[in-house]
C-alpha cells in the first residue's frame, strides 16, 4: 500500500510517451516499450547524471531491522552463498569493513514516501508490471550470485562497484529490460 504524499513533497514528472528521455538513452518511452521491453536489455551509462539519492545507506540498513520491510542478507562464504531473511538485529548486519555481503530491501517506496518519487520516471510502464523499488547495499566484493529473476528489472547503480559507498563524480548506469 502506498503512503500518502507528504505535504510540500512534489511529484516528479512522468515521461511523455513520444518525448525522448535521457535515461532511456534518447529513446522515447514508446520506442523503449516497442523495441526493448521484455525483448532485450538496454544499457545506458550516466542515465541519471544529476541523481541524488533521497534514501541513505544508513536508511536502508535501518529498514533491514524493521519488521514491515522484506529484507534479505546474502553472504558469500567458503561453502558458497548463504541467504538470510530479515528483519535483522543491528548485530546481524555486517560492518562496512567486512566483505562479500549484500543487503536487499524490497518495497522501499511503500515505507519511505520520498523513495516513491523515483518510480515516477518509470510510470510509463503498465501499472500491473511496476511493482516496487528494491534497494541493495553491498560491502566490498558483495553480490548476490548468478541468478535469474522471474520478473522485469530496472537496475540503477548510483555507487561504485564493490565499494559499498557513494563516490562523487560517478554517473550511475541504468540497465533495463529482461534480467
Which residues fall in each region the model found?
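Non-catalytic, conserved peripheral segments adjacent to functional cores
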Residues: 38-40
